[in-house]
Structures are given as structure tokens and as C-alpha cells.
Regions:
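Proteins with a high burden of low-complexity, intrinsically disordered sequence enriched in S/T/G/P/A and R
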Residues: 1, 228-229
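Anion-binding (especially nucleotide phosphate/pyrophosphate-binding) glycine-rich loop
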Residues: 1-52
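Beta-rich strand-turn-strand
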Residues: 7, 212-218
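Phosphate/pyrophosphate- and phosphate-bearing ligand-binding catalytic cores of soluble enzymes
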Residues: 55-213, 229-248
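Short, solvent-exposed amphipathic alpha-helical segments in soluble enzyme
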Residues: 103, 220-221
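Generic non-transmembrane alpha-helix signal with a bias for helix starts/N-cap capping motifs
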Residues: 174, 219-220
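Recognition helices and adjacent regulatory flanks at domain boundaries
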Residues: 224-225
Length: 248
């Protein structure tokens, strides 16, 4: 979908290039990357309600979208709906600088001035290939921790401490959890059979671990290190499926 939209010159989802998964999963977690997220372009979804057996239309306000948080993955409705179709509204045009930090650095390093959706997609793909392991070759769940969202006062305080903050239009901000992990000296570290990626500290790679207990230990060590260093408590992004859970 992202590729097709970019080839047609539509903007709004180009920064979400190479996010694994299907379109139906996009509104469940309110996926996003490099300053864009699906909540900014989604209009409505059509879904199958597993409780009533009905086909329903759910509008954006009804989805209760926040950062990696929606009605579909949190609260009493978590897992209730099977997304059948997604309607989004894109626009003709281009993203304009300043971009999300890592994209901005990439643009400046290569002196790029073409910000068409197709070219932004190309650059995002290059960045992701450089930073993230190929899931077909190396086992990981992608970004293992959510970034930290802060209000305006908290964002001001973070910047005063030298912590980079990506600001929203309303002054609120997002702190890259990978930066916080790297600041603890954990980039490339081996923890209980897992390795913190030496390319992107948000990625936890399974090198030798054979049990969930090892994952628990590695996760706890990272969370504790970041809390002690910066005061922020990281939250896991991948959803855990309990043993024996019924799958639809």
C-alpha cells in the first residue's frame, strides 16, 4: 500500500515504509514511524465483531487512538474486532523539513532536496535497512520498547538535561527509547542470551536464549538501567500472547 501510494504521488504514509505486517494491523496498534502515524490519515475501518457476529463500521473517533494504543488492543474490546478494510485519506504534496531526527540527518548528509513521497520512501528504506536486522535472517521483534511520550513541561525539562525530544505541533514530545538505552552504554550489550543491537538499541536480538525467563531477565535489566540513568520507565511494545490463548 505504501509503495503504491508513493508511486501515485500521495503523501501521508511514506515514512511508514517497510513496517512489517498487513494493512489490517495498522489501526490496531496505530502504527507509525519517522514522524507519521496511521491516526493522522485514517478515516474508518470495516470490521467483524466477534462478540455479536456483525459487520461494523468504526470511525476514527471511535478507535480511541493514542501512541501505540487503540480500542482494538487495549481494554475490554482488545481482540474483539477483526479488521476487514481500512479507509485512509492521503494528499498530493510532499513532507517538508525539519524531518524526524534520523531522517533529517540522512537528508543533510546526502544534501537531498527532493522530498517527493517516492523519494522519502526510498530514503526511509535505506535507513531501515542500515539500522534494523533482516527478520528472515536474525530473530527479533523489531522495536522492543515504546518511545517515551512527554508533555510540554516534561519535554522542556528533558531538553534542559541534554535529552533529544521530537516535538509535536502542540509542544508535547517524544523521546527515543533507543537513545535512552544507548545512553546507558547498553548498545551492543549481551544480556541473558539476547543482544541489544549495535545498530539500533531499540532492537533486542535473540542470539542464544532458549526460554522466556531469559527474555524477562534481559528486559528487566534494560528497564532498570534506563530508570536509574534517566528516570524514565520503558514499556514493552510487542504484545505477548499467553500460552493456550484462543486465536481467531
Amino acid at each position: 500500500l505504501v509503495q503504491a501510494a508513493c508511486e501515485l504521488g500521495y503523501s501521508g504514509i511514506e515514512a511508514m515504509s517497510m513496517i512489517p505486517g498487513t494493512v489490517g494491523a495498522a489501526p490496531v496498534q496505530n502504527i507509525g514511524a519517522y514522524g507519521q502515524d496511521i491516526s493522522k490519515v485514517i478515516e474508518h475501518v470495516e470490521a467483524y465483531d466477534t462478540q455479536t457476529g456483525d459487520l461494523v463500521k468504526i470511525t476514527k473517533p471511535e478507535m480511541q487512538m493514542g501512541y501505540r494504543h487503540t480500542r482494538f488492543n487495549y481494554g475490554s474490546d482488545a481482540g474483539r474486532f477483526v479488521i476487514l478494510s481500512v479507509t485512509i485519506r492521503l494528499c498530493k504534496g510532499c513532507l517538508q523539513p525539519p524531518f524526524y531526527n534520523s531522517l533529517q540527518r540522512y537528508v543533510e548528509n546526502i544534501h537531498e532536496t527532493n522530498f517527493s513521497p517516492e523519494n522519502i520512501r526510498r530514503m526511509i528504506c535505506e535507513i531501515r535497512k542500515e539500522k534494523l536486522p533482516d527478520p528472515a535472517e536474525i530473530a527479533s521483534a523489531g522495536s522492543f520498547f515504546k518511545n517515551v511520550y512527554v508533555d510540554q513541561a516534561e519535554a522542556d525539562a528533558a531538553e534542559a538535561r541534554g535529552i533529544p525530544v521530537w516535538r509535536d505541533a502542540d509542544g508535547k514530545g517524544k523521546i527515543n527509547s533507543g537513545w535512552l538505552i544507548e545512553a546507558c552504554g547498553l548498545k551492543g550489550a549481551e544480556l541473558d542470551g539476547f543482544r541489544v543491537s549495535d545498530k539500533a538499541a531499540l532492537v533486542l536480538i535473540n542470539e542464544k536464549a532458549t526460554s522466556y525467563a531469559q527474555l524477562e531477565k534481559a528486559r528487566a535489566k534494560i528497564i532498570e538501567a534506563v530508570k536509574n540513568k534517566s528516570g524514565y520507565v520503558l514499556q514493552q511494545e510487542p504484545v505477548e500472547i499467553p500460552t493456550g490463548a484462543k486465536m481467531i
